[in-house]
Structure formats: structure tokens, C-alpha cells
UniProtKB/Swiss-Prot annotation:
It is found in: Cell membrane. Its main location: membrane. The keyword Amino-acid biosynthesis does not apply. GO terms for molecular function: antiporter activity; choline transmembrane transporter activity. The chain crosses the membrane at residues 34-54, 238-258, 262-282, 321-341, 347-367, 370-390, 456-476, 511-531, 606-626, 645-665. One of its GO terms (cellular component) is plasma membrane. Keywords: Antiport, Cell membrane, Glycoprotein, Membrane, Transmembrane, Transmembrane helix, Transport. Residues 55-237, 283-320, 368-369, 477-510, 627-644 are extracellular. Choline/H+ antiporter. This is Choline transporter-like protein 5. It comes from Xenopus tropicalis (Western clawed frog).
Length: 714
């Protein structure tokens, strides 16, 4: 007999061989990617140490409380400024914009006061009314502490800024005094006045303050809006929680209904697409036919050239003919895909239905996203607190405040305690050593930017690890369901808890490695976004083009890595191998079933999109009618609101996040069942000695023809 020729080796590896001992996720495992696990633990310890150092050096009061020119906090308990909670600027005209004010970079004396001025006044007026004690008593509260009944000349007082040269009616915002701007008939006013006296007694128009207070009016209006939004939340939070609970119930019901309606939803959509494209073909033909004989309609697109008005092209028969041909091609492609891929589409729909059935047997998986949410919330909180403490780790830096054109020492660093003994006060009359910002010269302060970048990177790593842990845990639970020969009798007890234990005990290193790769790509994308922001004003077109290409490439790379990591975690949950081996096995398995992968991915994406739209839309519509009091039986129950969109928007966002949490479990379930299904087809042939583990529904859809062909190959 002639020797049988060996089958050519597949470039994507050999199919899985039948193993009578294989019953799903293996129990005997060993720790994988130990080195990465050790690095991960060391990084976490270092991250904790960084947080401790930031906690020691940081002082959030620098953000909570405004700081005066002496580096003292306004409103801090136990200090002389305890009752002085607001920061006032002596000469607001020196401030370029509200952003400068908020960032404490305005080159004028800043003083903590108990209240903002409520009238116009100048130091010259005070001197003119020096015999009126009530006038001085009001004005002196805005002077430096201890400055009472001055003997200095007016020039010296204003030069040394012992008192403000003028005060302006102001309102507190962000614990700072801002001019009380308003508009009347389109005219800018302050306290209903359009003119005021400046510090030297000259009349000036209120518009002179515009550069220092541009946008202040909008900011003050935003404060009012913010208070109203807070009131709306206070009166509607109970109903918001009820709406979110309804969203959770609707999401659960949708997942249950998918077992029976997945195919209906998909085929309705396909028929709808075919119908819409068919209508487009008919409409293009109608437009093409109606333009017959119209003067100029027979010109070609080449004849009229490039036109900025697109409507010109719609008056040509050639345009509608091109549209009609294009739509015909699309229609033919869709129909051919349905003809040749119909069986794979049916398998995809059956897997979706099987996913709903699996979740029904392991209901605890629906609540696992809560654990992922808690882990991510902890990561976000720790990152935010660490970032704030690092940002406030600086020591107070004081600089000389003087006229730059007359004083060469302006803006240099100074020490308040010794400033009056230096030559600066003699060479630059009126110069002051005032607080500028927070900084430092130590190693820690010099590398705060590096530490902030490390904070961001480790944050990304931990968040991705939390997501990876959830995916691996869910994959192990759903794999236990699939490889149970008799469902649900053979499903192991507590499959979710067992899978979680295996992932933590054996595969922390593998999950850390996968999340590290993804975190690196995401970190690079953040840097590219920062560079793109910096280059927006640049005229270098080549640099913008290169940056755009890099952003596109890394976006695609991130999507690919997320996809591969997801499938690698499934293989880790089943076989317990290291990350690289699992990723390779998953990739080869997917490539051996590439058409099924594409079909299942699109069908799943579509149905989950429908689910999110259905849950968010249905709950959102219900919330809209309730909060706008358009439900007659609940009119009296609806709270009185300033803005109904406040709770409505909260309900919409919350409903979407809840639906996303439920459907992420469903998507992981379908992906896991799909990989198990592909392996089932490779391992077994449906015979009594090698029976399939798939459900009877999948077995029936697979068809006798494919089963028999597999038996022949075996």
C-alpha cells in the first residue's frame, strides 16, 4: 500500500486533539509569569510609598483655601484669618484675566478679608473725609493688619500698598472678591454705575475693568446655575435612584429575552437595511429619470469640475447614476453575504442565545461588575488624592513685586523675614516680598512632574488589571458552564468564586503582564494627545501629519491589544498557561475560525448596541415624562425642579453605565462560549466516543453535513 501523504501544516497551528480527560477549566495549575507578578507587587508598594511621601509633603489647603501675599490661608481655623475667608486684590486692574486671579498670579497685594467691598471708594476720598470716623472704620478693614490712622503721606501709603488705592463693589466667588459686574441695556456696569474714580482721583469707565474681569459675569451666572442644580439633586435624588433601579431591571429582562429574541432582532435589522438600501436605489433611479431632458443635466462631473456647492452635482444625471450603481453594489454584497454566511450567522445568534442561558444558570456573574467598579473607584480615588497632594507639595515661594521697568530686582526670589534688611527696599522704593506660588528645590520637588507621570501610568496599569481580573474571572465561570456535559447538573459549585480564586492565586502575573502592555499603549496615546494639543497653534504641517498618523496607529494598536488580551484571558482561565502562550493559542484559534469571528463580533456588537439604546431610551423617556409632570397619575409625586434636564441627564448616563455593566458580562460570556465552541469543534466530532459539549440548539444548527465531514476527516 502506498503511504498516505501528510496534510500540510496550517500557518496558524494544528487543531486541538481529542483529550478524554479534558472537562473544562483545569484544576491543577501553577503560577504563571512570576517575574511580572513580582514587578507588579513592587510597583504597587512603590506606588503606596509615593502616596505616603505626597501625603507628608502635600497640603490640600493650598487648593481649598486662597493664600494672601504673606502665604497665609484665608479662613483657616486656629489662625488670625479664621473669620477672613475671602481674598481681595488691592488693584484688580493689574490682573489680566479671571484665570490669572484664580491661579494667584496677579501682581498686586492680596489680603484676606471677612467680606468684599460693597461700595466705590478711594484712599484719596478717605483722606478728604479723615474726620469722619465711620468712613475710615469701613475703609481700614481692607488695609493691611495694624495699619490704623497712618502718618505716612498718601504717596508712601499707595507706594507701599498699605491700603488699596481704591475699592470696588464686589461679590465673592471661589473665595475671592470679583467686581460686581452686570449689564443694563447692553451697557457694562458695576453697582449700576458706568464710571468710577481710580486711585489718583481720575474718572474712569467701567469698561477699563474688562481686561481684568473678562468672563466674570458668566462665571457668576454659573454660580447661580450651580446652586440650582444642587437644589434639583437634593429634591430628586430619591427618584433618580428609582429610575436607576428600573434600568437595572430592564437590563436584566433584556438579557433574558435575548434567549428568545436575538434572531428576531437581527433579522429585522437586516431586512430593514435591505429595504432602506432598496429604497435608495429606487430614489436614485427616480431622480435619474426625472432629470431626463433637463438642460445641463447630461453634463458630466468632469465637465463642471470642482464645485464648493454640492447641490450643483445633484442636478446631474451622472451623479444619481453613480449613487444608484454604488447602492446596487452594496445591496448585492449584503445579499451575497447573507446567502454564503447564513449558517455562520445562525451559529452566532445561537451563541448569543446560549450566552443568555449561561447567565441564567450563573446569575452571580451579573453582579461581578460591582466588584470591578469598586476596584476602579479605589484606583481613581487613590490616583486623584495622590495627584492633589503631589500638586500641593511645594513650599511657599516669595518674589519681589515691583515695577519691572524701574527695578531690576522685580520677580526675583526673596525671603520675607530678611527682605527689609536688603538693598532692594532702598533701590526699589515700594517693592514688596509677596507670596507667588508653591515650589521647592529638593529632589522630590524637582521631580514632581516625573512622579505625576508615574502616578498616571501606574493608575492605568491598575485600572487595566482590575478589568483583566474581571474578564478572567467571568471567562472561567462561563467556561465551566460550556464544558459541563449535562447542564446544569455538571456545572461546578460556585463557578464564579472558584474562577476568581484561580485568577488571583495563579495568574496575577499574567493578568499584570497583559494590563501592562495595554497601559503602555494608553500612556503613549495620552502623550500624543498632549503633543497634539500643544501643536494646535503650530504651522508645521508635516509634524501635525506625523502626529495624526501616530495617533491613528496607536488607536488601532490599543483596540487590537484589548481584543487579544480579552481572548488571552479566556485561554488563561481555561488552561492556566502564561500570558504569551495563551495569547498565541487564542490568536491561532481565532485565525482558524476567522470568518466566524467576524460574523459573531458584528452580530454581538449590534445586539448589545440595541440593548443599550433600548435600556437607556426606555428609562430616559419614562424619566422625561415623570420629571416634566406629563404622567397624570404621578403629577403630584414629581418634584418641583429648576432644570428638569439635571435629573434626566443623570438618569440617562446612569442607565447607560448600568446597561454597559450588565452587557459587558454578556459580551464576555459570548466571547468565552465562542472560543469553547471552536475548541469543541476541533476536539470532538459528535460521535458517541467524542460527543460535542455544545447545546442541542448549536448541535442542530451545525448540521449533519458538517458533522459527517468531520467524522470522515477523523
Amino acid at each position: 500500500m502506498g503511504r498516505r501523504s501528510a496534510a500540510p501544516t496550517s500557518p496558524f497551528g494544528e487543531p486541538r486533539k481529542f483529550d478524554p480527560k479534558f472537562k473544562g477549566p483545569i484544576g491543577k495549575r501553577h503560577c504563571t509569569d512570576v517575574l511580572c507578578c513580582i514587578i507588579f507587587v513592587v510597583v504597587i508598594l512603590g506606588y503606596i510609598a509615593l502616596g505616603v511621601v505626597a501625603w507628608i509633603h502635600g497640603d490640600p489647603r493650598k487648593i481649598i483655601y486662597p493664600t494672601d501675599s504673606y502665604g497665609q490661608f484665608c479662613g483657616q481655623k486656629g489662625t488670625p484669618n479664621e473669620n477672613k475667608t475671602i481674598l481681595m486684590y488691592f488693584n484688580i486692574l493689574r490682573c489680566a484675566s479671571p484665570v490669572v486671579l484664580i491661579n494667584l498670579q496677579c501682581p498686586t497685594t492680596q489680603l484676606c478679608v471677612s467680606k468684599c467691598p460693597d461700595r466705590f471708594a478711594t484712599y484719596l476720598d478717605m483722606q478728604a473725609n479723615r474726620f469722619n470716623n465711620s468712613y475710615w472704620e469701613y475703609y481700614k478693614q481692607f488695609c493691611k493688619p495694624g495699619f490704623d490712622k497712618p502718618r505716612k503721606s498718601i504717596t508712601e501709603v499707595l507706594r507701599d500698598e498699605d491700603c488699596p488705592s481704591m475699592i470696588i463693589p464686589s461679590r465673592p466667588f471661589l473665595q475671592r472678591c470679583f467686581p460686581d459686574f452686570s449689564t443694563r441695556n447692553g451697557v457694562l456696569t458695576v453697582a449700576n454705575k458706568t464710571e468710577f474714580k481710580d486711585g489718583i482721583g481720575q474718572m474712569r469707565n467701567v469698561t477699563d475693568l474688562r481686561s481684568a474681569a473678562n468672563g466674570i459675569n458668566n462665571v457668576l451666572d454659573a454660580r447661580s446655575v450651580g446652586m440650582k442644580i444642587f437644589e434639583d439633586y437634593a429634591s430628586s435624588w430619591y427618584w433618580i435612584l428609582i429610575a436607576l433601579f428600573i434600568a437595572m431591571v430592564v437590563s436584566l429582562l433584556f438579557l433574558i429575552l435575548l434567549r428568545f429574541t436575538a434572531g428576531v432582532f437581527f433579522w429585522i435589522f437586516i431586512i430593514g437595511v435591505i429595504g432602506v438600501v432598496g429604497y435608495g436605489i429606487w430614489h436614485c433611479f427616480w431622480e435619474y429619470d426625472s432629470l431626463k431632458g433637463v438642460p445641463g443635466a447630461d453634463l458630466t462631473i468632469y465637465d463642471i469640475g470642482l464645485q464648493t456647492d454640492f447641490r450643483v452635482y445633484l442636478q446631474l444625471r451622472q451623479t444619481w447614476l453613480a449613487f444608484m450603481i454604488l447602492l446596487c453594489i452594496v445591496e448585492v454584497i449584503i445579499i451575497l453575504m447573507l446567502i454564503f454566511l447564513r449558517n455562520r450567522i445562525r451559529i452566532a445568534i445561537a451563541l448569543l442565545q446560549e450566552g443568555s442561558r449561561a447567565i441564567g444558570y450563573i446569575m452571580s456573574t451579573l453582579f461581578y461588575p460591582i466588584i470591578t467598579f469598586i476596584l476602579i473607584a479605589i484606583c481613581i480615588s487613590y490616583w486623584a488624592v495622590t495627584a492633589v497632594f503631589m500638586a500641593t507639595s511645594g513650599e511657599p515661594i516669595y518674589k519681589v513685586m515691583a515695577n519691572k521697568t524701574l527695578c531690576k530686582y522685580a520677580d526675583i526670589t526673596c525671603i520675607p523675614e530678611t527682605f527689609n534688611t536688603t538693598n532692594v527696599t532702598r533701590l526699589c522704593p515700594g517693592a514688596q516680598c509677596t507670596f507667588a506660588f508653591y515650589g521647592g528645590e529638593s529632589f522630590y520637588h524637582q521631580y514632581i512632574l516625573i512622579f505625576q507621570l508615574c502616578n498616571v501610568f501606574v493608575f492605568l496599569w491598575l485600572v487595566n488589571f482590575s478589568i483583566a481580573l474581571g474578564q478572567c474571572t467571568l471567562a472561567g465561570a462561563f467556561a465551566s458552564y460550556y464544558w459541563a456535559f449535562k447542564k446544569p447538573a455538571d456545572i461546578p459549585a460556585c463557578p464564579l468564586f472558584s474562577s476568581f480564586g484561580r485568577a488571583i492565586r495563579y495568574h496575577t502575573g499574567s493578568l499584570a503582564l497583559g494590563s501592562l502592555i495595554l497601559a503602555l499603549v494608553q500612556f503613549i496615546r495620552i502623550i500624543l494627545e498632549y503633543l497634539d494639543h500643544k501643536l494646535k497653534a503650530s504651522q508645521n504641517s508635516f509634524a501635525k501629519f506625523i502626529l495624526c498618523c501616530l495617533k491613528c496607529c496607536f488607536w488601532c494598536l490599543e483596540k487590537f491589544i484589548k481584543f487579544m488580551n480579552r481572548n488571552a484571558y479566556i485561554m488563561i482561565a481555561i488552561y492556566g498557561k502564561n500570558f504569551c502562550t495563551s495569547a498565541k493559542d487564542a490568536f491561532f484559534l481565532l485565525m482558524r475560525n476567522v470568518i466566524r469571528v467576524a460574523v459573531l463580533d458584528k452580530v454581538t456588537d449590534f445586539l448589545l448596541f440595541l440593548g443599550k439604546v433600548f435600556v437607556t431610551g426606555s428609562v430616559g423617556v419614562l424619566a422625561f415624562f415623570f420629571f416634566t409632570r406629563k404622567i397624570p397619575v404621578l403629577t403630584d409625586e414629581a418634584p418641583a425642579l429648576n432644570y428638569y434636564w439635571v435629573p434626566l441627564l443623570t438618569v440617562l448616563i446612569g442607565s447607560y453605565l448600568i446597561a454597559h455593566g450588565f452587557f459587558s458580562v454578556y459580551a464576555m460570556c459570548v466571547d468565552t462560549l465562542f472560543l469553547c465552541f471552536c475548541e469543541d469543534l476541533e476536539r470532538n466530532n459528535g460521535s458517541s466516543s467524542k460527543p460535542y459539549y455544545m447545546s442541542p440548539n448549536l448541535h442542530r444548527i451545525l448540521g449533519k453535513k458538517e458533522i459527517l465531514s468531520k467524522k470522515a476527516k477523523r
